[in-house]
Each structure stands twice: as structure tokens, then as C-alpha cells.
């Protein structure tokens, strides 16, 4: 699902989801723990929960 999410970012934002968000905050990318840092990180957290 992570690769699909990256493809969605590529199509919507016009930038590489992996390179821009692969290591962003606590939840964007592989794994995740702690409290989301901001709205973007919260979006990744919500995606991880589905």
C-alpha cells in the first residue's frame, strides 16, 4: 500500500512521494511511532491505520 500511496502523491502533487515524504515526520514512510508532527504527518498516520 505504501507504493500506491507514493504513486498517488506523484500524480496529485507532481513530485516523488518517496523522495519528498519517505522519511517525513513520524509516520510518512516505513514504520511509525509517537505523535504525528503536523497535518501531513497526521495524513500518513491515518493512512497507516487503514
UniProtKB/Swiss-Prot annotation:
What molecular functions are annotated in GO for this chain? Answer: calcium ion binding; calcium-dependent phospholipase A2 activity; phospholipase A2 activity; phospholipid binding; toxin activity
Q: How is the cofactor bound?
A: Binds 1 Ca(2+) ion.
Q: Which reaction does it catalyse?
A: a 1,2-diacyl-sn-glycero-3-phosphocholine + H2O = a 1-acyl-sn-glycero-3-phosphocholine + a fatty acid + H(+)
The active site lies at 47
EC number(s) from the headed UniProt entry: 3.1.1.4
Q: What is its main location?
A: secreted
Q: Which Pfam families match?
A: Phospholip_A2_1
Keyword Hydrolase among UniProt keywords = yes
Compartmental location: Secreted
Family assignment from sequence similarity: Belongs to the phospholipase A2 family. Group II subfamily. D49 sub-subfamily.
The record ties this protein, via PANTHER family, to: PHOSPHOLIPASE A2 FAMILY MEMBER (PTHR11716), PHOSPHOLIPASE A2, MEMBRANE ASSOCIATED (PTHR11716:SF9)
What the protein does? Snake venom phospholipase A2 (PLA2) that displays a potent enzymatic activity as measured by indirect hemolysis of red blood cells. Is neither lethal when injected into mice nor does it present anticoagulant activity. Displays a moderate inhibitory activity on the aggregation of platelets induced by low levels of ADP, thrombin and arachidonate. In contrast, strongly inhibits platelet aggregation induced by high doses of collagen. Shows myotoxic activity, increases the plasma creatine-kinase activity and induces edema and myonecrosis of mouse skeletal muscles.
Name the record gives this protein: Acidic phospholipase A2 1
Q: Which organism is it from?
A: Lachesis muta muta
Amino acid at each position: 500500500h505504501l507504493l500506491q500511496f507514493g504513486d498517488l502523491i506523484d500524480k496529485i502533487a507532481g513530485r516523488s512521494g518517496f523522495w519528498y515524504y519517505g522519511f517525513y515526520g513520524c509516520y510518512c514512510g516505513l514504520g511509525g511511532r509517537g505523535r504525528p508532527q503536523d497535518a501531513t504527518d497526521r495524513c500518513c498516520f491515518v493512512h497507516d491505520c487503514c
